[in-house]
């Protein structure tokens, strides 16, 4: 739904989400082990969609303990997605399972 969307990395380290509306909370759910993960966020043919909050879940579905479950972004500020119709942004994340911390960087405007 547009309020909460979970990107589940427990079975694959690469995911894709086509945005059809604004999302309040994106939750990245990670496996029990540390690793590198990637999600492509695609704007639909309308575009103009964004994500308000970027959060984490551990493998059991609980909020990540590190940083109160909030994704840590390069430069200290969460990305703003490219809102042009049919454009894509790639979010790359390193998940530190021991400390339940997600470090993210976005490559934008493809």
Predicted regions mapped to residue ranges:
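Acidic, glycine/polar-enriched metal-coordinating patches/loops
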Residues: 17-110
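Extracellular beta-solenoid/beta-roll
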Residues: 1-12
């Amino acid at each position: 739904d547009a309020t909460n969307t979970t990107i589940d990395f427990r079975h694959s380290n690469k995911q894709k989400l086509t945005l059809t509306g604004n999302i309040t909370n994106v939750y990245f759910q990670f496996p029990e082990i540390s690793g590198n993960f990637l999600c492509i966020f695609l704007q639909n043919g309308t575009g103009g969609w964004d994500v308000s909050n970027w959060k984490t879940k551990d493998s059991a579905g609980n909020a990540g303990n590190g940083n109160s479950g909030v994704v840590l972004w390069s430069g200290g500020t969460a990305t703003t997605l490219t809102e042009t119709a049919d454009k894509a942004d790639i979010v790359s994340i390193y998940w530190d399972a021991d400390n339940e911390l997600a470090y993210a960087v976005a490559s934008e405007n493809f």
